[in-house]
């Protein structure tokens, strides 16, 4: 696949639940204000997308307990954003100041709970089709489905060996599945010790081991039609002895501008 100058360096991954009774209000606040004012207008952030997991999708998550989401069905909404390569710190400096300003000016939303929010750095991307939708465009392509996977290396397994084993032994089966477009792997971006104190609210779990790999799988179909492949992926990982799968979750793309799914969480 041809490369172009606009390249992803990092991702903001934020998985959140509206508090009961505030589902519509949260959805409207986020997509009509915070999606833009808290993220998209910031420097070097060039794409964003929102995803939702109604109850039938939450029921497909595995394993039953996860250090990434506690409980495993936490996180009804997921937002993912691309930050340009070599400019993540510039964006994060702006974002820290911006969220303080927004809350100080009455533009926060306290009736929500973070399941897991963090910054991740891109380390690998693989495609089902050599001329498929580039990862840089995958949020703007509006895929109908997204799968999130998290794996942790076994004791003594290096980050490089963990990634290489997945790419060789587990990823090909996913990419051979009809509807799956691309797979990407991300490592946790180093965070300042006072990161939590800079946020107006707790940011959810620590995600598990520091050396985990968060993986995004963009799906050109209803994600439930591909979920057997995700289960097979998990079995391959857990049986391989090199890593363990700690979280697998499907999402639909949100129907922007509507209250769809707010009554199904």
Residue ranges of predicted features:
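Macromolecular interaction modules
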Residues: 1-265
């Amino acid at each position: 696949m041809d490369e172009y100058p606009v390249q992803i360096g990092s991702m903001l991954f934020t998985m959140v639940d509206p508090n009961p009774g505030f589902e519509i209000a949260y959805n409207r606040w986020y997509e009509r204000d915070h999606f833009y004012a808290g993220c998209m207008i910031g420097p070097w952030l060039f794409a964003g997308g929102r995803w939702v997991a109604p109850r039938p999708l939450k029921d497909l998550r595995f394993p039953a307990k996860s250090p990434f989401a506690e409980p495993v069905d936490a996180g009804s909404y997921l937002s993912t954003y691309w930050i340009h390569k070599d400019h993540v710190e510039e964006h994060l400096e702006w974002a820290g100041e911006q969220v303080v300003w927004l809350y100080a000016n009455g533009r926060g939303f306290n009736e929500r709970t973070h399941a897991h929010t963090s910054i991740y750095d891109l380390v690998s991307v693989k495609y089902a089709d050599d001329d498929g939708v580039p990862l840089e465009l995958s949020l703007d392509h509006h895929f109908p489905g997204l799968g999130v996977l998290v794996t942790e290396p076994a004791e003594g397994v290096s980050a490089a060996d963990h990634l290489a084993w997945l790419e060789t032994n587990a990823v090909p089966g996913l990419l051979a599945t009809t509807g799956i477009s691309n797979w990407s792997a991300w490592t946790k971006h180093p965070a300042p010790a006072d990161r939590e104190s800079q946020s107006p609210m707790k940011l959810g779990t620590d995600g598990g081991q520091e050396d985990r790999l968060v993986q995004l799988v963009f799906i050109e179909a209803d994600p439930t039609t591909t979920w057997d492949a995700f289960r097979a992926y998990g079995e391959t990982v857990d049986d391989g002895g090199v890593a363990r799968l700690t979280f697998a979750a499907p999402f639909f793309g949100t129907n922007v501008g509507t209250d769809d799914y707010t009554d199904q969480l």
